Swiss-Prot record:
GO cellular component: cytosol
Main location: cytoplasm
Highest taxon, organism lineage: Bacteria
Record's keyword terms, sorted: Cytoplasm, Hydrolase, Nuclease, Ribosome biogenesis
Listed name of the protein: Putative pre-16S rRNA nuclease
Entry's family note: Belongs to the YqgF nuclease family.
Alphabetical list of SMART domains matching this protein: YqgFc
Length: 164
């Protein structure tokens, strides 16, 4: 497993490979998936965290069943750009995943992703109970969509045949 920049991931991905977005929390891991064209992020499921070995296996099972080519994981930065208190835990999670998978990870600034997800769910008139169930996968979707937008921009600037 390697930690890549988004630019490095753009170079390593083959056409029509999906990537997953992760919103790592203390109690849950929100998951989202891209389409094969890597244009759209869709909220998927939430893994209830137990302990690392169980969490990692659940994530790897998801990756295998969805044919994931890589992960974009939210990095919880402070608004001033400094490392937030959960950055160290996120980096440790990825370091531990190095022992479990060869799939690459990209860190993606997740500032305001949960706020944006909450706002979207409110606008969709989702009940409070349903919002609580869906917020983590929705936040993962916002994280992944940001990375997908960047990948699309990189493809256009390279004259990639798959760009819009």
């Amino acid at each position: 497993m390697t930690v890549l920049t988004i630019e490095e991931m753009a170079e390593t991905l083959a056409p029509r490979q999906a990537i997953a977005g992760l919103d790592l929390g203390t109690k849950t891991i929100g998951l989202s998936m891209s389409d094969l064209g890597r244009r759209f992020a869709t909220p998927r499921t939430v893994i209830r965290r137990v302990k690392f070995a169980i969490d990692a296996q659940a994530l790897l099972d998801f990756a295998q069943s969805e044919k994931v080519a890589g992960f974009v994981i939210g990095l919880p930065m402070n608004m001033d750009g400094s490392a937030g208190p959960r950055v160290q835990a996120t980096r440790a999670f990825v370091r531990n995943m190095e022992q479990k998978t060869a799939l690459p990870f990209v860190y993606w600034d997740e500032r305001l992703s949960t706020v944006a997800a909450e706002r979207t769910l409110l606008e969709m008139d989702v009940s409070r109970a349903k919002r609580a169930e869906r917020i983590d996968s929705a936040a993962a979707s916002f994280i992944l969509q940001g990375a997908l937008d960047r990948l699309s921009l990189l493809a256009r600037s390279d004259g990639d045949e798959f760009s819009a």
